[in-house]
UniProtKB/Swiss-Prot annotation:
Protein name as it appears in the record: Naringenin,2-oxoglutarate 3-dioxygenase
GO molecular function (one): metal ion binding
Species for this entry: Matthiola incana
Protein residues bound to 2-oxoglutarate: 284
Domain Fe2OG dioxygenase: 189-293
Amino acid sequence: APGTLTELAGESKLNSKFVRDEDERPKVAYNEFSDEIPVISLAGIDDVDGKRGEICREIVEACENWGIFQVVDHGVDTSLVADMTRLARDFFALPPEEKLRFDMSGGKKGGFIVSSHLQGEAVQDWREIVTYFSYPVRNRDYSRWPDKPQGWAKVTEEYSEKLMGLACKLLEVLSEAMGLEKESLTNACVDMDQKIVVNYYPKCPQPDLTLGLKRHTDPGTITLLLQDQVGGLQATRDDGNTWITVQPVEGAFVVNLGDHGHFLSNGRFKNADHQAVVNSNSSRLSIATFQNPAPEATVYPLKVREGEKAIMEEPITFAEMYKRKMGRDLELARLKKLAKEEHNHKEAAKPLDQILA
């Protein structure tokens, strides 16, 4: 079997392991863009008297409505963003054996994966990824960072640092919005983890049957996503009834709030419900930077507003929260698979005239 997806991209029919059930298939095209997700300029965010209040209001409104927004004028240098994107594309263009040198299977911390790093997935995602842990710095395992293309480690280090700064700045705004000290959300993460996932979605022969990344919410605090101009990121705020495709904005970061951010705000801020779709015209690249709390950090609302109840019964660690989330996901997948098998079994047992009726 081919070791990478890039090799399957040229086939005319989609391999059955990527085919999703009908209820999970894309409802909206990858390039049918919506401008419902706000694009917010951060120019002047540090002027305490000036623009800061207005920017804070826009961010809070976006978090209450969607849990997702885009930021421009964010202070991350455009040439750094261009370098990071170029190196990522160059990596995925390498021959399969070069990419597979960094194969992550067998419990390695970081590296190259086809489809997904989760065990027990019934249907595969149409993507290749390279992932590594960048914070805390002591957790960096440079042997798992690609050594090709040249310059990857140096550019990634700078990119990681700049995005850590941007994430903390956004968390300060959300802390203030909750009526807390501005360091509150960052402190709640204890020693903030950062994981970078570079997603590559090759051209797909039958994109209407599959997903690049299945529907989910991110488990962590906040995610900063850099995407190219192709389009494919989709979001829903009514539990999947209607989906919109996020309009790519040159040089912007898409900001998603995760489950941890949702719980800390006592549900006031939404955890973005999203997925990625693919297409048959061109490949797509996105770079997700996940800002997560330390595994031992406590997950519990930082503030419960008057007249409200806490949305969690008890404080738990982030490690436990993550474990429960994965357990639920696998259980849902298992039940779905069972129901499907049962349905197929019943269909097979029907007499032919009934099936054709």
